Amino acid sequence: MKLSHLSLAIISAITLAACGGGNDDKPMPQDPDNGALVEQRNEAIKKKATAYLEDKDGKAPALTKDEEATLSQIDENLFNEYKKKQKELENQASDDEVDPTKTGVVGNLDLGKQASQGTTQYVRGTKSSFDAENNPKEVSSATAILGVEAKTQNPWLTNIVLARKVRADGTVSIMQYLGNDGSDAADFTNVKSLQAQNDHNVVKFSDLKTNKPLDEAKLEAQKKQVDLIIKLYEKIDSSEITTEEKEELEKFVALKEELNAIDIKSPEGYVGLDEKAHKLFSETGASGSDDIIFGDDVPTNNSVLGTADTGSGAIPPVKPIYTSGKPGADATGAGALGLVGMNFKVGGTQEAIQGTEEKSQSSTRVFGRQYNTQSRAERKFNSYADAAVLALSSEKDLANAIAGITDQSELANITADMKNAKINYHLAVKPQKLDYVQYGRVTGNLDP
């Protein structure tokens, strides 16, 4: 008996199904004939992938391409974990020094394919060593801002200097990096290096006490005092009030607006400068910490930094001895100790502290980023990471001189205290602890 065309088609379909079907790449189906073998193979692949994930010595074998394809079908989560570790190990081998996070990507840049910074055009002087190592023959070229190959970059900040500045009088100062914890700073043997100076200027965050929020009750008490003073002036008949009294009233109205604008949480997490003692305010508003000094209070020592003509001849860095909050001249520190080197004109008003870019010389860049909330033409704020001008202590900075005012107070007594009826502002900075830094050498003007 001959088979009909329909019978042949049915037999062909059954045969294909039993073989797993044409070009299908999925794992073999578990039919009664091969199901046990497929299950054993799948378990073996998962066991091999798990061993690869748990391996700490790098000795476990990787999956083959076919095994990876099978794993992606039978256990998607395990496959994703396997591929993640595989990429981490590849990055660790190729970019171990500059990528401590082992992601291979920084700011959406693949470090293996793209530059982590743009380029800058330069003309190198005949005596300058700028970029000479990487481009010995090119005196005019475009070079990466980093200026060094990836393998020579350092994720732990030990070779980073933010800026080196030669002032008009010829003295040299450097701006230090924001420090890591002093306990895990490297042990440097070359005491003449700028790296040794950076290590010397590390901030110990465990000792640093940042400001707490303002006392809300005391702030409200100051507001009530100002309200009482305004009411005393407003009681004066409009035909009798003098020009001086009108001006005084305007000052207290402005002071009220300032007090109302203060956010009690604004100083939280900041450290601020006591311009009289050249120390930091503690979290209670008292002056006392020598962990960080703002400004060029420690003389920059040319024997540490070297000059345009000679190299460094430094002895090991010497920490300063403080007298009444001011460091002595015996230290070999470079500029300011610790957090950020700052140079500014101190004062009790926002304008005096902030100044302008020219007056305050606040041109320091923190890791290449200049901190400003306004355009270059309009800005007045200092160019430091999270810099602010704040009232820090609970009541001393908040128009404390006008305490004790009552409805019966004499305007003459209030007028006598006018000059002290103000908010005292302080330059403050929010400390930053940098656990990982992806780029090695972020510099300012390092060459003569």
UniProtKB/Swiss-Prot annotation:
User: Is this entry keyworded Hydrolase?
Assistant: yes
The GO molecular function terms of this record are:
serine-type peptidase activity
Q: Which domain of life is it from?
A: Bacteria
Q: What keywords sit in the KW lines? A: Hydrolase, Protease, Serine protease, Signal
Q: Show the segment(s) annotated as Disordered.
A: 87-109
Which residues pair up as cystines? none
Q: Which residues form a coiled coil?
A: none
What is the E.C. number? 3.4.21.-
Cofactor annotation: a divalent metal cation
Which class of enzymes does this protein belong to?
hydrolase
**Which spans are transmembrane here?**
none
GO BP annotation list: proteolysis
Q: Give the signal peptide, or none.
A: 1-20
Q: Which family does it belong to?
A: Belongs to the peptidase S17 family.
Function statement = This enzyme is a chymotrypsin-like serine protease. Degrades a variety of substrates present in the skin and hoof of the sheep, including elastin, keratin, fibrinogen and collagen. It seems to play an important role in the pathogenesis of sheep footrot.
Protein name, per record: Extracellular serine protease
Origin species, per record, is Dichelobacter nodosus
